[in-house]
């Protein structure tokens, strides 16, 4: 939906670099890959993700994710300390060094937490991760590239400040609530 509504993928580019932040990989990467396949593109695309290292094999569909990662040659990065924690600057630098500074046409910040027990603090509890995703995207995106960032609410001043910061680095900023989102 976001890909089509905002025309964020230029199919004249034969080799795309896509980076998913706090994504293991998730639905947005799957949509990106399927979109590129529909145009018989994507064979040369480079796909990277950084995600928290998860050793719990009880997570539903984790084996399905592993099959997806192998099939589409997704490079999972766990950072310099092998945790995948974006709160650590060394891990952001490690990812930028692996992918290439300002080399990506598309970056997504798709991190989130389980807020089912504390929904009222969702925005506040997400601010640190959102800031880290912004820092990483600014180091990864090409000039003219696209950054899709998932945020939950826009009530706090700091969230508005983040949007203002993004407006200084990106030509356009859009807000949307996709139909399938929570």
Enumerate the language-model features and the residues they cover.
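Generic recognition of short, well-ordered alpha-helical segments
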Residues: 128, 160-161
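Conserved beta-strand signature within the Rossmann-like core of class I S-adenosyl-L-methionine
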Residues: 137, 144-151, 174-178
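Short strand-turn motif at the edge of the Rossmann-like AdoMet-binding core
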Residues: 112, 150-154
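Short "lid" loop at the C-terminus of a central beta-strand within the Rossmann-like core
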Residues: 53-54, 153-156
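A short glycine-rich, Lys/Arg-flanked "PGG" loop and its adjoining helix->strand segment in the class I
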Residues: 128-146, 167-168
